[in-house]
Each structure stands twice: as structure tokens, then as C-alpha cells.
Amino acid sequence: MEKNWWKEAVAYQVYPRSFNDSNNDGIGDLPGMVEKLDYLKDLGIDVIWLSPMYKSPNDDNGYDISDYQDIMEEFGTMEDFNHLLSETHKRGMKLILDLVVNHTSDEHPWFIESRSSKDNPKRDWYIWADPKSDGSEPNNWESIFNGSTWEYDDTTKQYYFHLFSKKQPDLNWSNPDVREAVFKMMNWWFEKGIDGFRVDAITHIKKTFEAGDLPVPKGKQYAPAFDVDMNQPGIQDWLQEMKDKSLSHYDIMTVGEANGVNPDNAKEWVGEKEGKFNMIFQFEHLGLWSTGDSKFDVLSYKNVLNRWQKQLEGIGWNALFIENHDQPRRVSTWGDDTKYWFESATSHAVVYFLQQGTPFIYQGQEIGMTNYPFESIETFNDVAVKTEYQIVKSQGGDVNQLLDKYKMENRDNSRTPMQWTNEVNGGFTEGTPWFPVNPNYKTINVAQQSEDSDSVLNFYKRLIKLKKSDDIYTCLLYTSDAADDLLC
């Protein structure tokens, strides 16, 4: 396989709202990131993946973009971004952005035009359909955030499609004008000097609407639609166009969020020649825990890792991760965040880090941050939880049962503020944090672990050095000779 800079890198995901607050308004920001660049450099980071910082009304914490070429006011200005980019490069690190192009915000100018009338030139930039004869939704597909994928718009008497929240209408990728606008925007960022994109929800841009209504599982109002809205036939043509008109023109790092891709069809996604991205985030290993059994299935985990490593060997590259902004903390779900907290944090780190691929660390993972101790359903900020809460409440259901359902697996668990010190609010802010800091910040924080040579943080530093050593880095081949009941 070819040697590339991104194969030798260690990446770190920053969720800006929760990383570091420089002006004490309770919200992390871009200047706050600059303040912590030396920390990331000292940790051994080569690439920073910055979650969305674009202008957004924040229905889904920035994944609902209203302007791709402007900065969310809470995070700073474009001047602040330029300074962040410059300071990152000055330290020999690279910066990649989160690219969300399956959908926009309903406050994006494109959608405002699209919904204004059926005759608007941008009407076909989004997905519109007439109601059924009884006035109901065009089909019975379920949103990833619960409820219907369709929202009725009274102005034009049609429904628009939203795979995520109703404030995140899906772009119509079958329209070539949409694709051209997206590629033009991507190239604008590349010309500014960014080093790549992590492309959000990219397997969802192609839908098979011809499938119509789907079987509705017992106890549900709508039908899960992953089989018809994820990695559908024809998607590779659009991704090839993205590669031809944008990605292939720059020395960049590209990562596709590729839910629904399996090792058998991964070659067209990440193959050295025909692949559309350098690497992908696949979720098969994370899905093992969400089956409903909170126990960690070592054998199944091992088998999944084996399959991805073996089937991509010599063909494509793996993106290695166990946490991100959408996942709960692994020390709490796959391990024991009390008695065996240290062992849980470090053992899982070794297993995923030393496979062949580029490892990603999610902020706070390197100090063993844990799930938040939720005590009421009203505490949640996650739009998926809030949507189901409203549905259950409107139907007269037991909203208290949602707490047991979501307290371990909600997305807020990974979005609590970074724990820098044992001072008020964990050193994240001197103001009121946008979301409560985990109460265990007094014992789990960067400052304390920096002084302890045997801490989780210093374990990660040693692990990163090992990953980068001449004996083990890029050319590491994966083998697993352990007995079936052992992970390695």
C-alpha cells in the first residue's frame, strides 16, 4: 500500500461547544481551542477533527447548517477560524472539518427559497412530495430522531423529507445543481487551507423512495428505513463525482461516516484506487453494545475487528475509534467506570489503537471521562431524546421509562464539558456551562493526570508514541492468534 501522511497520523476530535470557553459565556469557542493547541501537540496529535462550527440555529448542535461559509456566532468569527487554522499549522498539526451535506438547516437560504413556492428555482433542491389521499405522509418511514421523516408545509401543501430532525431537511442529491453547489463550497474551504473533511451521514444521500411504505414493527408508529435510505445503489456515482470535482485535487485527508457499509463492499469506499475516501467510520463494532445487552461481548467484538482488518488488508485503510460525539463513553458502557475505571480505559485503548489504521481520540477519552449521571428526562439536551419525549408525552405514555432507556446510550454523555482541572466547572468556564459538567471532574481531569505518570492521560501519551515508532506505525499488519475467549 502507498505511504501517506494521514496513515501515519493520530487524530483528535474536538466538539467545540464543550471543549474550552475563552470568554466565560458557558460555551466553548474557537479562541478557546487555540488556548489548548499546545496540550494537543504535547499529547502527540497530528490531526484535529473539528465538529461543525458553521453558522447554525443549533437545533442539532451545529449539524443543522444555515451557512456553510460563515461561523456560528457563539463560537467566534471567520477571523477567529483563520487564526485557529494558522496556529494549528504553526504547530505542525493539520485541521479537518465536519462536512454535513446530507441535509441543511431549514433556515438555510436554499431551503427558504425552496419552500417559498412550487415554482421557485430551488424547489427541487430538496425532497418534496404530495400527501396521500387521506392527507397523511407520503410514506411511513421513521426518522433517525424518531417520528416521521416527513413534515407538512402549509404554504405549498406538500411534505418535505427530513431523515433527521424536522429542522434538517434533506438535500436532493439527484439534482446536479445541488451537487455542483456542494462541490463549489468544499473547494472554497480547501482553497482556504483546511486539510480535509470528515463527511457526515454520507451513506444517506441516496434514498430508494420507490420502496414506498415499509413493514412497521410492533409497538412503533413508523417503519425504520435503513434498508432504503442507506448505502443505496447509485450512490457511488455521486461520490465519484465528488472525488473528481473536489477531493482528488488536493493533498487532504477524507473520512466518510459510513453507517451501513460492510467489509464486503468497503473497497469501493476506501480502496487505494477506486475508493472515494481515504478511510471510513464504520459502526459494526459499536452496534454490538446497542443490542440491548449491556454486557461486553468479547468474542463478537474480536470477530468484528478481525473481519474489518483482514478484508481491508492491502486494499484500503481503517479509521480506528471507539468514541465520538454521538456515542456514550466506552469506559461506562464496555467497561466498569468505578472499581475498574483505569483498567477499562486503558485496555480498550490498546485494543483499538494498535490495529492497522489511523486512530481517532474523542475529547476527554484520553483522561477516561465517563457517562453523565442523569437523574431526570428533562435534563437531556439530545434532540433525539427530546423528540421521543414529546411523542410519548403527547400519547399519554410513561415518560419516566425513557430515563432508563436513554441514560446510558444518549448522545449527551459524550457532550459534557471537557474536564481540565478540579476547579469550578472543571476549568471549562467561569460562567454557567451550557450543559452541566460531570460531577466527577474533581477526580478525573487533565491537570491531575498530567502530574501522575501512571494516569490514563500519560498511558495515552505512551501509546501514541508506540503507534508512531519505526517498528510499528504504518506497516503494522494485523494478526490475532488468541483463543476464542480472549480478545488478544
Model-identified regions with their sequence ranges:
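Acidic/aromatic-lined carbohydrate-recognition and catalytic surfaces
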Residues: 2-187, 191, 204-262, 418
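Short, polar loop/linker segments at the starts of domains and inter-domain junctions
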Residues: 20-34, 295-298, 335-341, 428-434
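Hydrophobic residues within beta-strands of alpha/beta enzymes
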Residues: 48, 197-199
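Conserved alpha/beta catalytic core and glycan-binding cleft of carbohydrate-active enzymes
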Residues: 106-140, 239, 243-417, 422
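Glycine-rich phosphate/pyrophosphate-binding loop
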Residues: 149-161, 165-173, 411, 416-466
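Active-site rim elements
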Residues: 169-179, 226-229, 330-343, 404-405, ...
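Conserved small/polar residues in nucleotide/adenosyl-binding loops
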Residues: 478-485
